[in-house]
């Protein structure tokens, strides 16, 4: 599996708005509608990437914990599906149900949202404050498939905890690592 690291997304940048199909219930959902009262975590993921599969359980646990605190999670898959049909909307819905995703799983068919965020890999994590200003863009933690490190979500947890405690933005933000987004 080829490794791709996330691109830089400037701290303080405003999250570009979007409206996409939520594959969980086939409704249209915008960032404005789905954002959290205290913050929002945007994650670019897909069904087939081993890096995403490796952290799925932790994502569900973390989302359940932090959504109760006012930080909503929104997952987006932007992979092209002609060559990667396993990342299509029907299978996204199936994965969301099997994994018990407590968050919307949106399909970015045109890849415009991934381009607006300069997303590069799956998983790719962005944390925004209540005004949708970027406070974090980077990795979940140091765990990778087969490196033996436990999935803790420590980097994202630190960013969300700083946000909830009104502390300064974390300066040391390690890029996310995963499968490259499958562009058209």
Q: Locations of the language-model features?
A:
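Chalcogenol-based redox active-site neighborhoods
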Residues: 1-172, 180-184
